[in-house]
Design a protein with these regions (language model features):
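Mid/C-terminal beta-alpha module of Rossmann-like enzyme folds, strongest
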Residues: 1-82, 95, 118, 124
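A conserved mid-domain beta-alpha-beta active-site/ligand-binding segment of alpha/beta enzyme cores
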Residues: 85-86
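Glycine/small-residue-rich pyrophosphate-binding loop that anchors the diphosphate of NDP-sugar donors
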Residues: 90
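C-terminal/domain-terminus segments
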Residues: 100-128
Length: 128
């Protein structure tokens, strides 16, 4: 992070790094579904790493059908990390007081950031 490396007030400081807003997955799912022109499904309490373990051939078919770059699913997603991110039994609320006092002012809208990043992946033919 260039800002932390070049800002004297940031020297030797621990910071929480978040977008600056509070969001929940239940609020993001409709946006993600809309991005992919899909309906929102029901809540499932399964591990993605288990449910996706045998889906590499399905991804290969999707990639072929949409003329995507040839990436193995395992090259572009880490299922255990998604399981961690999806399975929090609590809201992630991190204080940005320390980083704000050091001079950081940027705030990102999580919904916009997620869809912007997905659009970049789509534009680069990594996802359909």
């Amino acid at each position: 992070m260039v800002w932390a490396a070049t800002t004297p007030t940031a020297a030797n400081q621990p910071f929480n790094i978040t977008n600056g807003d509070y969001t929940r997955w239940k609020l993001l799912w409709p946006k993600l579904a809309a991005f992919f022109d899909m309906e929102v499904g029901n809540v499932q309490t399964v591990k993605t790493q288990d449910i996706m373990a045998d889906k590499e051939p399905v991804w290969a078919e999707i990639a072929e059908a949409h003329q995507l770059r040839k990436y193995a699913m395992s090259d572009i997603v880490t299922w255990p990390f998604l399981d961690y991110a999806f399975a929090n039994g609590f809201d992630q609320m991190s204080s940005l007081t320390n980083i704000r006092q050091a001079g950081w002012t940027e705030v990102l809208d999580t919904e916009a950031t997620v869809t912007d990043q997905l659009q970049k992946l789509r534009d680069n033919r990594i996802i359909p």
